[in-house]
């Protein structure tokens, strides 16, 4: 069985919902466990360019958002569902 690691960054307020959705789609299965993941918190920085539709801030303005990095493992067959 080939496993892949999927990593994503989400605003902290959305992290629980994203972790559950990834687990429900088949990520995080380790033996007799499911919905397994690892998270770490940090600051995400970005500047939206023209044509962007930022959830935070505005075009051309640097933003900083507290984010959670979520890591899960996933069987190859489930990657598309998890993504």
PLM features: residue spans?
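Hydrophobic structural segments
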Residues: 1-83
């Amino acid at each position: 069985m080939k496993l892949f690691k999927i990593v994503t960054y989400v605003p902290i307020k959305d992290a629980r919902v994203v972790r559950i959705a990834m687990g429900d789609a088949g990520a995080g299965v380790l033996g007799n466990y499911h919905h397994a993941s690892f998270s770490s918190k940090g600051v995400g920085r970005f500047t939206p360019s023209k044509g962007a539709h930022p959830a935070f801030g505005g075009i051309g303005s640097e933003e900083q958002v507290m984010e959670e990095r979520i890591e899960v493992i996933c069987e190859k067959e489930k990657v598309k569902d998890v993504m």
